[in-house]
UniProtKB/Swiss-Prot annotation:
Keywords: Nucleotide-binding. HAMAP family: YajQ. This is Nucleotide-binding protein BC_1159. GO terms for molecular function: nucleotide binding. CDD domains: YajQ_like (cd11740). Belongs to the YajQ family. Pfam families: DUF520. Nucleotide-binding protein. One of its GO terms (cellular component) is cytosol.
């Protein structure tokens, strides 16, 4: 009897890469002419990014700089969940962006439905914050990977432990 093959679908953000991107973005903000004298800042508090600036326009520019640096460091931007812009101390505005780690129940159901619609002989299991896909045929697993990649999910997914 042939051994089953499997892989895990996960959604992770590498925190050291996020820290590196923040440091590079802060250097650019300090050196840019249009940010001279502004109180623009980016901080990482556990898994929440806190963006601070003088006004909403500059806050959007800070966000654009940060996003460009995150993209260069291969950090998935889909996993950033931005909150509302709120007033902070000293005539500044603040916005929080939460880093989403893992696959929540709703997205796990969406992934499950995508795989079930393919009508292949594969089994899926939701394990905490990841989805395990098992099948006898590796070709079926490759088809599942292609389908999940092409699906329009609200989070970025990675495929690990391919056996």
């Amino acid at each position: 009897m042939a051994k089953d093959s499997s892989f895990d679908i996960v959604s992770k953000v590498e925190l050291p890469e996020v820290t590196n991107a923040i440091n590079i973005a802060l250097k650019e903000i300090q050196n840019r002419y249009d940010f001279k004298g502004s109180k623009s800042d980016i901080k990482l508090e556990k898994e929440v990014l806190v963006l601070t600036s003088d006004d909403e326009f500059k806050l959007e520019q800070v966000k654009d700089v940060l996003i460009s640096k995150l993209v260069k460091r291969n950090v998935p931007i889909k996993n950033l969940d931005y909150g509302k812009v709120e007033a902070a101390t000293g005539n500044t505005v603040r916005q929080r962006a939460t880093l989403q780690q893992g696959i929540d129940k709703d997205n796990a159901k969406k992934i499950n439905n995508i795989i079930k619609e393919m009508k292949l002989k594969v089994k899926t299991q939701v394990q905490d914050d990841q989805v395990r896909v098992t099948a006898k045929s590796r070709d079926d697993l490759q088809a599942v990977i292609a389908a999940v990649r092409s699906a329009d999910l609200p989070i970025d997914v990675q495929f690990i432990n391919y056996r």
